[in-house]
UniProtKB/Swiss-Prot annotation:
Gene: OSW7
Organism whose genome encodes this protein: Saccharomyces cerevisiae (strain ATCC 204508 / S288c)
Function: Involved in spore wall assembly.
GO biological process: ascospore wall assembly
Modified residues (Phosphotyrosine): Y354
Keywords from the named record: Phosphoprotein, Signal, Sporulation
Protein name as annotated: Outer spore wall protein 7
A GO cellular component entry from the record: endoplasmic reticulum
Signal peptide: 1-23
Comp. bias (Acidic residues): 169-195
Region span, Disordered: 167-195
Leftover remarks: Present with 3170 molecules/cell in log phase SD medium.
Length: 510
């Protein structure tokens, strides 16, 4: 809108400038004041007088000619045909188009502000109504689809031969007719026996496809308990009953296979889940313990550096300071004064501190590992309880649903088989025995899950290995400090021997 305002302002400025140039070109700039009395008695402005009324033969023209004689007549004749007059006309027309566009844009904006919220509400309502409209569409279309589903395989004549597919398009029908006409023209001289053989082959191929598709559809519909959607793919009711009986047997075997596989995999699934959780927890705990061991090594190295500096100052020299009246101790070079005289007790306290720190770390580490083992045992037990709960829910649902299907099989079997047939009675009894046997296996497997010993081998092996590694590290640290202690003892003995010799030398002099 700012750009439109700037453009309109510039156009108005151009219009006024052009208007002024027109007046200056034609010498009418000084006549504006003289024409004011005429404008008072007419409805025209000065500009409109020049635009439309200063023409030959008008009343205004006669008045001006009479007042100003012939001086204005050339201007009156020249002004309407001026080039600037045409430019001004173009400017007026352009300005009118812009004004009309702005008015139209304002109208569109007002309509949008009023209709926009309403359309938005309608769009939201349509979005929430879409699932219901889809359901209505499915309800209306399903009966028609179920009743016409068989028609996609073709229509049949009275003698049972295939004529043509019902849902064939017009283009396919025309192509089929053209092919028939061409075949008739080309095969006029062929024997009728060959034609009969080809027709029989076509019927045989179609029957094979039809039977295979019918079998799969029958089995699917029987398993889904939707017998209304069974596609009749045979010519006899006996074959349909055979398909349904086979589908019931297939469903029975499918139930047995599904439940039996779950029973055999329940224990393995529990152990696998526990092991995967243990691996993740061990990895996190290993990172924590590695960080603690790094801190221990850093502390031990700092103590070793401090201990080495003290051991180095055991071979010190002493000088008497008469000013302070005391003995001062310097390092072996005699240049650096020592803060304190190195004694066995100071070295012993350093070694004692390192032993206490190492012992505290060992206790903390072992306590952390024991807590981790207890925590992992509780975690494994919670996983076991969760798996048992899931298994119980699965067992209840599967056994209850399977028992319902078994009852349905018995009811349907009475219509499909001879209920007094010994083979049918024996098979039905065998099915129920297998059902009860599998049900007992489901219950026994649940009890096995509850009493199953949780495999903590991964955690125990990791803790054992970690303790062994720490023991090796501890032994290395102790060996290092033991070497430093032996070195300090040797230096203390040498220093004591040296001090004894000095004392004897002093006594001999005195």
């Amino acid at each position: 809108m700012k750009a439109v305002f700037k453009v309109t302002t510039a156009l108005l400025a151009c219009v006024f400038i052009a208007r002024y140039l027109v007046c200056q070109q034609n010498g009418l700039g000084s006549f504006a004041t003289d024409l004011q009395p005429i404008c008072r008695h007419t409805e025209f402005s000065v500009g409109s007088l020049f635009d439309s009324k200063l023409v030959e033969g008008s009343a205004v023209s006669d008045y001006l000619v009479g007042k100003y004689s012939q001086s204005i007549k050339p201007l009156i004749e020249r002004y309407p045909n001026s080039s600037l007059k045409r430019i001004m006309g173009y400017f007026y027309r352009f300005w009118y188009n812009i004004f009309s566009f702005l008015r139209l844009n304002e109208l569109c904006c007002s309509l949008h502000s009023k209709l926009g919220p309403l359309l938005n509400h309608l769009r939201i309502a349509w979005y929430y109504l879409k699932p219901y409209t889809d359901n209505v569409k499915n309800v209306l279309e399903n009966p028609f689809n179920s009743s016409t589903d068989w028609m996609k395989y073709g229509s049949f004549s009275a003698d049972g031969t295939l004529t043509k597919p019902i849902f064939e398009t017009d283009s396919e029908t025309e192509d089929y007719e053209d092919d028939e006409n061409e075949n008739e023209d080309e095969d006029e001289d062929e024997d009728e026996d060959d034609v009969g053989i080809e027709d029989e082959n076509k019927e045989y191929e179609f029957d094979g496809v039809q039977d295979g598709h019918g079998n799969s559809q029958l089995v699917t519909a029987a398993i889904l308990q939707d017998l209304s959607k069974i596609i009749i793919g045979s010519n006899s009711h006996a074959e349909l009953e055979t398909y349904e009986a086979e589908s019931l047997k297939m469903e029975y075997e499918a139930w047995i296979k599904a439940i039996d596989s779950k029973i055999h995999s329940a224990m393995a699934l529990l152990d696998s889940e526990i092991q995967s959780v243990f691996e993740a927890e061990v990895q996190n705990k290993s990172i924590e313990i590695t960080r603690n061991l790094d801190d221990l090594n850093t502390t031990v190295n700092e103590q070793l550096v401090f201990l080495d500096s003290k051991i180095k100052d055991i071979n010190c020299t002493s000088k008497f300071d008469p000013v302070q009246n005391k003995i001062k101790y310097f390092d072996e070079s005699g240049q650096v004064e020592l803060e304190a005289y190195i004694t066995k007790s100071s070295i012993t306290s350093i070694l004692k501190n390192y032993k206490i720190h190492l012992l505290d770390f060992e206790k903390s580490l072992f306590h952390s590992l024991d807590s981790f083992l207890t925590e992992m045992a509780k975690l494994a037990e919670s996983i076991r309880l969760e798996n048992v709960e899931v298994y119980e829910e699965w067992g209840d649902v599967m056994i209850s649903q399977w028992s319902q299907r078994m009852a349905y099989m018995d009811v349907r079997g009475l219509h499909l088989e001879d209920q007094y047939d010994p083979a049918y009675i024996e098979e039905n009894h065998s099915n129920w025995l297998r059902f009860m046997e599998l049900k007992k296996k489901v219950i026994s497997e649940r009890n096995r899950l509850v009493k199953h010993d949780l495999d903590m081998t991964l955690i125990l092996e990791w803790i054992t290995k970690l303790k062994a590694d720490f023991q090796n590290t501890k032994n290395n640290i102790q060996d290092t400090f033991l070497q430093r202690m032996n070195t300090a003892d040797t230096l203390f003995k040498n220093r004591e021997l040296k001090e004894q010799l000095e004392e004897e030398f002093v006594r001999q002099e005195h």
